[in-house]
Amino acid sequence: FQIFNAGAAIAALRALGKDQAACEAAVTSAFWPARMQRLRFGPLVEAAPEVELWLDGGHNPAGGAAVADTLARMPARETHLICGMLNTKDVRGYMHPLAPHVTRLHAVSIPGEKNTLPAEATCEAATAVGIKAVTAASVAAALTQIVADCPTARVLICGSLYLAGGVLRENG
């Protein structure tokens, strides 16, 4: 979906008379926080220095498919999700494309969000689409569980822009 957005932006730049160099600069310098964003500093990274830590706010089937495509292109590595979602989303639709790429999902509730899907329900949805899943009290607790099992895992915190925003605020 980001390719379509980039295409629209390039079309707008061309309509404004911008040259190819301006279009290339615009696309290559674009940054959207919490869209497969690598976390490289902060308390979460310090708690798991050997973990490859990522953050993505996708929360619908198209977002799940985009993340799955990205994971499929990455070098092989044990991959864990820390996932919190809203009760208004198609949780199974989001998770289904991720199933082949995930070692385990650690389900969390989204702190302070009244429409959070309880971690237990997120866990059940993951299990229903073939993902091994457990619950955790928080993102930090899930990360601690993951590091204890596989200190060099790839970890993707995902499932909600609300969860992603909270992680960015708390992680610095």
Regions found by a protein language model. Name each.
Residues 160:
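Active-site-proximal loop/hinge segments that shape catalytic or ion-binding/gating pockets
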Residues 14-15, 49-55, 95-154:
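C-terminal helical cap/extension that packs against the catalytic core
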Residues 1-104:
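Nucleotide phosphate-binding/pyrophosphate-handling subdomain across enzymes
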Residues 163-165:
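Short, active-site-adjacent cap segments at secondary-structure transitions
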